[in-house]
Each structure stands twice: as structure tokens, then as C-alpha cells.
């Protein structure tokens, strides 16, 4: 599922439904940094950039922050304390506007950081895909315990970030993956989700945008990555490239291995989070390389209120359960051939 949609209860329900209705083993992977949203247990804190933005803005506008509302560097903040801080800032800004000391049409932007559960951080993609692949390898090695065929089919279903991870798994270990059904995957690395977007433009690149009456709070996942070329954690072009699904040379190398059947659904109006133009370019490239691939671009006529609920933008509020009901049976009926001497290693240029 996507980063905003991951929910233990929901995914468990889907897994149980699939296991009960189809002859499959369902694998849910608690991969690295899977819980980096507030409703899933993540915490709010202010790093040095967040504090600098907050402090400098308040000083410029002569807004006094009471000691109990003043965040401490890298210290978790309870949700109630965060809401009190927001309320205080909105109240002060309203007063300034009433006194015509501030542009009444402008909303001020502040930032905050998101601490995932288990004290993890956003590595983005690579470690998460490796967690999934390690879990797959474990199940395949112990196939008898899971009542599977000796060479079981491996099918990946994903939504948004989960869809991206499904495609990344196939890039890293094509011999393991037979089929992918995904909705709304991004195929390039979104700067907003790497964690250091605030270093570049804190009003533009962020995980979460909370637009309130007088302020906009932009949340960023905790990350070690930085745009600083002198840092050992610099997010270099090579780090970007290995995570990029659309890289032309990498796709050519992938195509020389076992090719997964790839079925995608995407919203015609998804222009920011996962631009539909990039998904079209991806599928055009796959077709030229001999993949069995299909891209469904949802438009207004596809809205049925059940499977696809809207085409306003990213995700379409698609029913994952109905996606599985639609796409899983034909995949289970299909035979996937593997060469006896197929390569089980892959290397990509940086």
C-alpha cells in the first residue's frame, strides 16, 4: 500500500480475504520505515532546519512563543502540543492581519519532521525492496512449510509507494517476480519523499501538506540523505539512479533477464505525485523491450463509485480488494516460463 494508506487492520483484512478465496499464500512484509505516518504511530519533532524556519519567522513578525510551546531540537512532540503550537501561531497571525501588519492574503509555511516507529529513517526504496525480497526468498526456500509448489509463482500487488516497491523488487531480482499488478506507482524518485526537500524548497517539496487557516505545515520524513555534496550521506546521482524505475539503460539490462508481466492503473490527472506522463513513457519502453505489459489510464468515464471512485489525482481512491479480484485470477491461470539456466544475478551501472 501507499505510505498514507498502510494500515495493519486493512492490509490484514485484504490478506485474509485473498488467502480464503484463492489458492495462494499471502505475504505481508513489515519492511523498513513502513510506519512513517502519524496515524500509524510516527512522532513529530523539529530538526535544525525546522527550528530555524520557526524561530526566524517568529522573530521577524515579533511573535512570542511561550516556553511550553517552543520545540526543542530533535525532541518528540505530542500531538496535543503540536496542535497548541499551531493554534497559537494562527491566533497571532490573525491579530497581525487585523492590525494590517501582515499581508492578509499570504499563508506562512512552517516545517516539521516525522520520526517513523522503531526509530527508523527514510532510506527510500532500496532497503524496503530488499526486505521484501528477503522475505520472498525465505518463503520460497521453505516452500513445503507454506504448502507451496516447489517453484511457486510470485505475484506482487501494490498501491502508490507499495506499487513502486513492487516494480523495484522486479528490477533488483527479475528471476523472482512473475507478475506485478500496481496502481499509481511513481517510476522516478520523487524529491518530496526523500526527506531533504526542505533543503531545496521547503514550501514545495514535502511528504505531507497540512493547510490551515493562516498557516501551512509541511511534514518531512526523517532521513539521513542530504543535498550537501560534502556529506557522506549525499544523495548522489548513483543513489538516485538505482532507485529509478524509468532509467533507460537499467531497463535494457532488466529486459535481458526474466520479464514480469506488468499491469498498471493510473489516474489521468495524476500530474505531481506520480506523473502519468512518466508512467506512459515507462510502459512504452517496456513494450519496445518485449514485456507483456498493460497500462490502464483512468478517466472520468471509468468512475463507478466502487472500483475507481474519482480521477481527481493520485490514487483514485481505488479499491485494492476489487483490483485483486479483477487481476489475480487470470494471473493464477497463466503459466510463467523460466529458462533452466536463467541468470540469478544482475548488475546496473551507476
Where is each model-derived feature located?
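Residue-level signal for short, function-critical loop segments
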Residues: 2, 160, 268-269
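Hydrophobic/aromatic beta-strand patches that form the interior of the parallel beta-sheet core
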Residues: 27-29, 155, 181-183, 263-265
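Short, surface-exposed "cap/lid" segments of acyl-processing enzymes
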Residues: 1-94
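Serine-hydrolase catalytic core
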Residues: 205-350
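Short, surface-exposed basic-aromatic patches at helix termini and helix-loop junctions that form
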Residues: 15-22, 144, 169-176, 255-256, ...
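Long, low-complexity, polar/charged, intrinsically disordered or flexibly structured peripheral segments
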Residues: 86-115
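Primarily recognizes the serine-hydrolase "nucleophile elbow" in alpha/beta-hydrolase
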Residues: 137-199
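Gly/Ser-rich "nucleophile elbow"/oxyanion-hole loop immediately N-terminal to the catalytic nucleophile
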Residues: 46-88, 115-130, 137-155, 176
Amino acid at each position: 500500500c501507499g505510505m498514507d494508506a498502510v494500515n495493519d487492520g486493512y492490509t490484514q483484512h485484504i490478506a485474509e480475504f485473498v488467502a480464503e478465496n484463492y489458492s495462494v499464500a499471502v505475504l505481508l512484509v513489515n519492511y523498513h520505515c513502513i510506519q512513517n505516518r502519524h496515524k500509524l504511530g510516527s512522532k513529530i519533532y523539529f530538526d535544525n532546519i525546522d527550528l530555524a524556519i520557526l524561530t526566524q519567522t517568529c522573530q521577524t513578525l515579533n511573535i512570542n512563543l511561550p516556553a511550553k510551546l517552543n520545540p526543542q531540537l530533535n525532541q518528540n512532540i505530542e500531538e496535543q502540543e503540536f496542535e497548541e503550537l499551531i493554534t497559537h501561531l494562527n491566533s497571532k497571525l490573525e491579530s497581525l492581519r487585523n492590525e494590517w501588519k501582515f499581508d492578509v492574503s499570504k499563508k506562512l509555511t512552517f516545517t516539521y519532521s516525522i520520526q517513523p516507529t522503531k526509530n527508523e529513517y527514510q532510506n527510500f526504496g532500496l532497503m524496503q525492496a530488499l526486505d521484501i525480497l528477503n522475505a520472498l526468498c525465505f518463503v520460497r526456500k521453505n516452500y513445503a512449510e507454506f504448502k507451496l509448489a516447489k517453484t511457486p509463482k510470485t505475484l506482487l500487488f501494490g498501491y502508490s509507494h507499495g506499487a513502486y516497491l513492487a516494480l523495484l523488487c522486479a528490477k533488483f531480482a527479475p528471476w523472482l517476480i512473475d507478475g506485478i499488478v500496481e496502481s499509481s506507482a511513481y517510476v522516478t524518485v520523487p524529491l518530496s519523499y526523500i526527506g531533504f526537500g526542505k533543503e531545496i524548497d521547503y514550501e514545495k517539496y514535502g511528504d505531507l501538506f497540512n493547510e490551515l487557516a493562516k498557516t501551512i505545515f509541511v511534514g518531512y520524513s526523517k532521513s539521513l540523505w542530504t543535498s550537501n555534496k560534502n556529506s557522506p550521506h549525499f544523495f548522489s546521482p548513483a543513489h538516485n539512479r538505482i532507485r529509478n524505475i524509468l532509467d533507460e539503460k537499467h531497463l535494457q539490462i532488466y529486459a535481458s533477464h526474466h520479464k514480469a508481466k506488468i499491469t498498471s492503473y493510473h489516474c489521468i490527472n495524476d500530474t505531481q505525485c506520480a506523473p502519468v506522463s512518466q508512467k506512459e513513457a515507462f510502459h512504452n519502453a517496456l513494450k519496445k523491450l518485449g514485456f507483456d505489459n498493460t497500462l490502464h489510464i483512468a478517466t472520468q468515464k471509468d468512475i463507478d463509485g466502487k472500483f475507481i471512485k474519482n480521477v481527481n489525482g493520485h490514487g483514485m481512491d481505488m479499491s485494492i480488494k476489487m483490483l485483486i479480484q479483477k487481476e489475480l485470477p487470470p494471473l493464477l491461470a497463466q503459466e510463467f516460463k523460466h529458462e533452466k539456466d536463467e541468470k540469478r544475478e544482475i548488475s546496473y551501472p551507476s
